[in-house]
Amino acid sequence: MTKREPDYLAGHTVLSLNFIRALRDVASEHQIPYLSFDVEHEVEFQGQKLTPFMEDFSLDYDPVATLAHVLSAADKRPHVISELILHPGFLDQFILQHSHLVYPRTLDVEMATSGQAIEMIERHDVQLVRYSELVDSAKA
């Protein structure tokens, strides 16, 4: 579809051991970095430590409070990448019928595009990083 290999493979949507093994095998076979998923533990990706934060499953989810939590963690552990996992984006019929994150997705978009979020990020002097940038830095 994109006429190039993906920058990395990750599969947190389907929590199946067989799926995860298959995804790791495909990543290995095609020499594509694999990003493991564990919201309860630090993970390593391309030589960097990542601490994931995904709180949008809670009933009282507040993405601004989650961002504040992530920024506080980043201040305390600057040598570790604090990974804020959001689910913003397009809502099609399949997602509307099957996702538990329909409402949190709208909250994520609102927060991620808000002036308040930008100001919070700037105040903490946080550098936003894409996974592809971690892949590129590991190759260098």
What is each stretch, according to the model?
Residues 20-24, 68-72, 117-118:
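Short amphipathic alpha-helical segments and helix-helix/interface helices
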Residues 83-91:
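Short acidic/histidine-rich active-site segments
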Residues 9, 84, 121:
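Conserved, mostly hydrophobic/aromatic
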Residues 20-21, 45-47, 61-63, 92-101:
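Histidine/acidic-residue-rich catalytic or RNA/ligand-binding cores of hydrolases
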Residues 61-79:
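A short, acidic, amphipathic alpha-helical segment used as a generic capping/interface helix at domain edges
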Residues 1-54, 58, 75:
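Catalytic domains of cell-wall/extracellular-matrix polysaccharide-remodeling enzymes
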Residues 98-140:
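C-terminal domain-boundary segment and adjacent tail
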Residues 33, 80-83:
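Structural motif
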